[in-house]
C-alpha cells in the first residue's frame, strides 16, 4: 500500500473515478460516473470479456427482473442491452399476482458482451483499459487517491470502485485439482486482498460454480420437453427505442435419473467441498447438483434445463447441473440424462472460490466506512448474480460521482425498491454465504413491482442526472395517460340494464345493482382490462403495458393503500437517525449481543439496527426509549453531555 507523503509516487494519469473490473457491476458503475460528468477510467483484466456472462447467459427471473427494471428506471444499461440481445423471453409466475411476475431472458452471451462493450467504448468521459489492480494509494488523511497495477503503473483519482467479481484471490477447482483463476482461462488478482486487510477490513471466502457446456449437435432434443418463449414479448427497458423484436429460440427440459444420482453419491469424495479441500460457503439458492442430491435425498429426480448460449454457437448451457466433479465423472453424469446419452462436452464444469468483504463494512451508499472514496460493488460484497451486481454498480457509480462533485451521497430505502432492499440487507446482516435477491426478502413486494419501477424511481434518476430530456418526456406522457385512464375507470359508470352491464353480469356471474363504475367491475376476480376492451369499455389507444398498469392500480388499490399505510407507520420510527458516535456499550438495557453487534455494524437508522442479526425487538424498544430519554434530557439541559 502506497501513501502520499511517505512513498515516492509517479502517477501516469489522473481521473475523477477509477472502476476496477469490467463485469456487470463495473459497466454500470463506470457508465453512471461518466454520464454524471466525471472523467472515468475502467480497468479490466481483458477488454474482450467486458460484461461477459461466465455462468448462465440469462438476465432476470424472480426478484432479479425487478432489479433490472429498477436499474433501467434509474438510467442504467442492463435492461437495454438485454432487450437488444435476447434469444428467448418468458414471464415466470404468471398464474400468480403481479407482485411476483418475473420476466426472464435467455441472452446471446457474445452479442450481449459485444453490445455492452460498444456502449462503454462510445460513452463520453469514459476510458477503458486493460490492467490488473493489485494495490491502492492513500492520501494524507487515509482517503483513496489512486490505484496501482500489477506492472507498477499508478493512476491518480478521487474515488475508486472495486467490482472484482470472483477474481479476488480466485481459485477454480475440478475434482482434486485447482488453478489460480477468477474464471476458466483468466488470471486471479493477487495482492489487493492483502492491502484491504492491512487497512483493517475483514475478508472471507465464498464459493460458486458453473455447469458444463455441451455441443448441441450431439444432443437428442426429441426426448426432452420443449420450452418455447412467450409469444407476447415483454421488455426490461421502459424506453421503446431499444425494443428489438427478435426470432426466439427454444430451451428444453430434461431430468436427472437414478443412474445420475448413483454416480454422484458414489463419487462425492471427489468433489472439492465433500472432499474437504474447499470450506467456502456456496450459494444456498443455486446449489451444485451434488448438493441437491445430498440435501434432497428423498427426491427421485431434479429438473435440468438445456439452454442455448448464442444463435451462432454450438454450446448449450446445462442449467441446474453445476459441479466440481472430475471431468471423467462429469461426462458420465451428463450421459445419464435423457437426451444427452451421446453428448460431447465442450467445457467442463468447475467450482470457484474467491475473497469477499462482508458488506457490513460499507455504508448504504456503498462507500467503505474505513476509507473515504473507496466503494465496493458486486460479488466482492458477497452477492451472486449479474443483476445484483449491476444494481450495486449503478448506486456505487452514482455516489462516487457525487463524492467527487461535492454533492451529498444518496441511498435507496428498502421500502422504495428491490435495490434498496438488497443494499440494506448487505449492509446490516451478517451474510456468510452468497446473497441472492428473492421476492420474499422484500416486505413491500406488492408496491415494488416490475411494472411500476419507472413510476417509483425515474423521478430519482432524473433528479440524480441519469434520465435525459427524451426519457423524461416519455415518462411524463406515459404516467399522464395511466393517471387519466385510472380516473376514467373510477368515474365512468355502467348501468345494470345497459347491454354492456348485462354482458358484464353474465361474464362475472354477479349482477350490477343499479350502476357501477368500471373500476368496481374491474376489481372483480373474473374481469380483466382485456374484457373491457372487447366490450368497447377500454381505451384501445393505450399500449398494452399502460392498460396493464391501470388495471393493476385499480384491481389492487385496497391492498396497495394498506401496504403504503404500513410503510408510512414503520418509516416514522425506522427512518429515525442514530448518532454516529452513539456508545452502545453504555446502554445497560441492551443485551450484550446486541451491544456488540450494534457497535460493530454502526447502523445509521433505527430500521437498519432492527435488521441486524442478534438484535431483537426488545433491544429496539430499549434503544428507542434510550433515545427518547436522551432527547428529553438534552432539551431540558442543552449543555448536558452526560449521555
Swiss-Prot record:
Any one GO cellular component localisation term in the record: cytoplasm
GO biological process: tRNA methylation; tRNA wobble uridine modification
Keyword match Plastid: no
A GO MF label: flavin adenine dinucleotide binding
Domain of life, per lineage: Bacteria
Protein name: tRNA uridine 5-carboxymethylaminomethyl modification enzyme MnmG
Co-factor requirement: FAD
Binding site for NAD(+): 282-296
Subunit structure: Homodimer. Heterotetramer of two MnmE and two MnmG subunits.
Cellular localisation: Cytoplasm
PANTHER family: GLUCOSE INHIBITED DIVISION PROTEIN A, PROTEIN MTO1 HOMOLOG, MITOCHONDRIAL
Organism expressing this protein natively: Synechococcus sp. (strain JA-2-3B'a(2-13))
Pfam (any one): SAM_GIDA_C
Alphabetical UniProt keywords: Cytoplasm, FAD, Flavoprotein, NAD, tRNA processing
Family: Belongs to the MnmG family.
Binding site for FAD: 21-26
InterPro entries assigned: FAD/NAD-bd_sf (IPR036188), GIDA_C_N (IPR049312), MnmG (IPR004416), MnmG-rel (IPR002218), MnmG-rel_CS (IPR020595), MnmG_C (IPR026904), MnmG_C_subdom (IPR047001), MnmG_C_subdom_sf (IPR044920)
Function description: NAD-binding protein involved in the addition of a carboxymethylaminomethyl (cmnm) group at the wobble position (U34) of certain tRNAs, forming tRNA-cmnm(5)s(2)U34.
